[in-house]
Curated annotation (Swiss-Prot):
It is a peripheral membrane protein. Belongs to the ATPase delta chain family. Keywords: ATP synthesis, Cell inner membrane, Cell membrane, CF(1), Hydrogen ion transport, Ion transport, Membrane, Transport. Gene3D superfamilies: N-terminal domain of the delta subunit of the F1F0-ATP synthase. It is found in: Cell inner membrane. F(1)F(0) ATP synthase produces ATP from ADP in the presence of a proton or sodium gradient. F-type ATPases consist of two structural domains, F(1) containing the extramembraneous catalytic core and F(0) containing the membrane proton channel, linked together by a central stalk and a peripheral stalk. During catalysis, ATP synthesis in the catalytic domain of F(1) is coupled via a rotary mechanism of the central stalk subunits to proton translocation. This protein is part of the stalk that links CF(0) to CF(1). It either transmits conformational changes from CF(0) to CF(1) or is implicated in proton conduction. This is ATP synthase subunit delta. Its main location: membrane. GO terms for molecular function: proton-transporting ATP synthase activity, rotational mechanism.
């Protein structure tokens, strides 16, 4: 995964710079998401790792994407095909989304709770994170009964484990040391 990120980073950065320059960040995000889905398609996978000439592969990929990819997006596809990097499109899309969130002063936070959170509880968590991170927060909520009670919040590099399972685990570690 780290290797894919390293390979994808320059493509994502270049795409993001072009998107900002042309005031088309959302358009680029949609294009890259679509292109990533195409590259992950089980029919397309063998072609990406096969011996098809890069120009033919790029033309095929662009024809499959159709009108979902504009001329600048097509140029990115061509460059990535020439370098044999179309298989990293999902990582490019993911990195682009991270750059977009950073640029827009937004962050996605994954909140895992033992029981479903009410909209009021979600709003309280969102408000607290917005104050702490100085960013607009978008919550992705899920449940996991194995937490016993409480929540685990992951937002960027920040991890807050307020679950009973986490507290029991930390207590167990202290008792064993």
């Amino acid at each position: 995964m780290a290797e894919l990120t390293t390979i994808a980073r320059p493509y994502a950065k270049a795409a993001f710079d072009v998107a900002v320059e042309h005031n088309a960040v959302d358009t680029w995000a949609e294009m890259l998401t679509f292109a990533a889905l195409v590259s992950e398609n089980e029919t397309m996978q063998p072609l990406l790792t096969g011996s098809l000439a890069s120009t033919k592969l790029a033309a095929l990929f662009i024809s499959v994407c159709g009108e979902q990819i504009n001329e600048q997006g097509q140029n990115l596809i061509k460059v990535m095909a020439e370098n044999g990097r179309l298989k990293v499109l999902p990582a490019v899309s993911e990195l682009f989304a991270q750059y977009r969130n950073e640029w827009a002063k937004e962050v996605e936070a994954d909140v895992v709770s033992a029981a479903e959170l009410s909209s009021e509880q979600q709003q309280q968590i969102s408000n607290s994170l917005e104050k702490r991170l100085a960013r607009k927060v978008k919550l992705n909520c899920s449940t996991d009964a194995a937490l016993i009670a409480g929540v685990i919040i992951k937002a960027g590099d920040l991890v807050i484990d307020g679950s009973v399972r986490g507290k029991l685990s930390r207590l167990s570690e202290k008792l064993q040391s």
